[in-house]
Curated annotation (Swiss-Prot):
It comes from the Eukaryota. Mg(2+) 2 binds at residues 94, 98. Coiled coil: none annotated. It comes from Zymoseptoria tritici (strain CBS 115943 / IPO323) (Speckled leaf blotch fungus). The record marks 126 as: Important for determining product chain length. The gene is GGS2. Mg(2+) 1 binds at residues 94, 98. Its EC number is 2.5.1.-, 2.5.1.1, 2.5.1.29, 2.5.1.10. The keyword Metal-binding applies. GO terms for biological process: alcohol biosynthetic process; isoprenoid biosynthetic process; mycotoxin biosynthetic process. Belongs to the FPP/GGPP synthase family. GO terms for molecular function: (2E,6E)-farnesyl diphosphate synthase activity; dimethylallyltranstransferase activity; geranylgeranyl diphosphate synthase activity; metal ion binding. The keyword Transferase applies. This is Geranylgeranyl pyrophosphate synthase 2. Dimethylallyl diphosphate binds at residues 103, 181-182, 218, 225, 235, 245.
């Protein structure tokens, strides 16, 4: 084995290095004879999810923003790949924290590979994504990556805290959480694109637009989780109720009826019973929370389209983004 006795910091005494594992100083990696096999193990849970693509909304949004930002092709490919890796890795952790059964119509990765291996795979991909981003050779990228991963975990941490303690947030606190959690990866992509591209407007305008889109996307997801039958096959029927999640419609209903513990009681059960879930949805309808949520979604979508025109400033390049927003609003 490697003998480090008597060495100073930064120095290693010469000694015997195991023939089974050699340190490659050229790229700070540890090479093994079966590295490819190791990678299959390490990436197994990630690949399980990555092989089942989602809606690819983030990739489409990156392309839409690129109409304005004109990022070099090679840099754009790196940013897209980093966002894809981070998104799927974060879903691996989300599914564990939410005890989800399904993801994209298949068993969640931790049910196939185990919780410990899935956590390790997600963390491994976080650092692979950082390594990928560093190939752009711009230290600002690492600062952006760090800031937005902190924001993502801040938002996720508050979401989990409210769920685990049965604390219903205010609407404003919920929107702040979503801006951190869901807006984080949208912002990471757009901030990196602003650095690599040629923005015609202030970077802050593009970033604000990205945050608004993230909030719109999450509230749409909250609404459809409770109302859209297509979610049943991919994620399960009204899964947010089983998770005990304070989603946007539920926050509105509880805050509108502070003396009624009905929804609190259902969330605490983490029920899988379809009949109980249907009764909860009926309660949301009676409270007007689903209609209220629809109204907020339409208002947000309008705000996004208005800001997109302001950012575009007459360039005629906003249509791709508008098309995405309009597709998101279908069947609402």
């Amino acid at each position: 084995m490697l003998d480090v006795r008597g060495s100073l910091p930064g120095q290693v005494n010469t000694g015997t290095i195991s023939p089974y594992r050699r340190i490659d100083r050229s790229n700070d990696t540890i090479g093994t004879s079966d590295l490819a096999a190791d990678e299959q193990v390490l990436l197994g849970p990630f690949n399980h999810l990555d092989a089942r693509p989602g809606k690819e909304i983030r990739s489409q949004l990156i392309d839409a923003f690129d109409s304005w930002l004109q990022v070099p092709t090679a840099s754009l490919a790196v940013i897209k790949n980093v966002v894809r890796m981070l998104h799927n890795a974060s879903l691996l952790i989300d599914d564990i924290q939410d005890n989800s059964e399904l993801r994209r119509g298949a068993p969640a990765a931790h049910h196939a590979f185990g919780t410990a291996q899935t956590i390790n795979s997600a963390n491994y991909v976080y650092f692979r994504a950082l390594r990928e981003l560093s190939t752009l050779h711009n230290p600002v990228m690492v600062q952006i990556y760090t800031a937005e991963l902190l924001n993502l975990h801040h938002g996720q941490g508050m979401d989990l805290f409210w769920r685990e303690t049965g604390t219903c947030p205010t609407e404003s606190r919920y929107l702040e959480m979503v801006g951190n959690k869901t807006g984080g990866l949208f912002r990471l992509a757009i901030r990196c694109m602003c650095v690599e591209g040629s923005p015609k407007q202030s970077s802050a305008d593009y970033i604000r637009l990205a945050t608004m889109i993230g909030i719109l996307f999450q509230i749409l997801d909250d609404f459809r989780n409770l109302t859209d039958g297509s979610y049943t096959s991919s994620k399960g029927f009204c899964e947010d109720l089983t998770e005990g999640k304070f989603s946007f419609p539920i926050v509105h209903a509880i805050r509108s009826n502070p003396g009624d513990s009905f929804l609190h009681d259902i969330l605490r059960q983490h029920t899988d019973d379809p009949a109980v879930k249907k009764e909860a949805v009926s309660y949301l309808e009676r409270c007007g929370s689903l209609i209220y949520t629809q109204g907020v979604i339409h208002q947000l979508a309008g705000d996004v389209l208005t800001l997109a025109d302001e950012v575009d400033a007459g360039q005629g390049r906003a249509q791709a983004l508008k098309d995405i927003v309009q597709r998101l609003m279908v069947k609402l």
